[in-house]
Amino acid sequence: MKILWIGRTQYAEAWRLMKSLHCAVAQGLTGDIALVTEHEPVVTVGKHGRLNNVIKWDVPVYLVERGGDATYHGPGQAVVYPIVALRWPLKRYIDAIEDAVIKTLGTYGILAGKKQGHRGVWVGDRKIASIGIAVENNVAYHGVAINVTIDPREFARINPCGLPASTMISMKELGVVAEVRDVGIETAKKLALELGLTPELISKPPEVPQVAEELKPVRVAINA
């Protein structure tokens, strides 16, 4: 699985690249790839989510294809978007993502795990990583966001995945110093290994046709 760090991005920009690569993987034009990024402030709401879980409309809000509810992305958060042709049951794939995050956090001395009845990765009763996946044409995309240095108070804009914002925690809050890029790339590497794939760092995206589709933010009136 190729792994590409694309730096800090606007969400719609990263989404379009992800969609283009998804189409290319589905058509056999390129192989499995994981994009690693850090977003400018944004809220996304999954296909089963509710807009009333968005509390504060001061950043762009997008409705997207992934599962899950509302989540916030921003600086200080490592986001990994694996674009992978599925040859495993979906549950096995999502478990592999969680396991990759748990093992990555373990290298920093953080004891993380899973929580019965909830997806994502947890430290006790606090959530440190959120997962949302979409599958089309048997190719999975979207992925996982790991809170590295992000201030958990940023999540007060939403009820994250229907949970109170106070549920969220970061590596920094746990006293761990880490770089967003390093955490994201290590997670992608560990995911490749969990899936029996060979991780390969690349410096630029494969040349594939770009989708014409553009993601537009939700437009609502904001009360003063």
Curated annotation (Swiss-Prot):
It catalyses: octanoyl-[ACP] + L-lysyl-[protein] = N(6)-octanoyl-L-lysyl-[protein] + holo-[ACP] + H(+). Its EC number is 2.3.1.181. The gene is lipB. This is Probable octanoyltransferase. Keywords: Acyltransferase, Cytoplasm, Transferase. It comes from Pyrobaculum aerophilum (strain ATCC 51768 / DSM 7523 / JCM 9630 / CIP 104966 / NBRC 100827 / IM2). Belongs to the LipB family. In the reaction, the free carboxyl group of octanoic acid is attached via an amide linkage to the epsilon-amino group of a specific lysine residue of lipoyl domains of lipoate-dependent enzymes. The record marks 127 as: Lowers pKa of active site Cys. The lineage of its organism: Archaea, Thermoproteota, Thermoprotei, Thermoproteales, Thermoproteaceae.
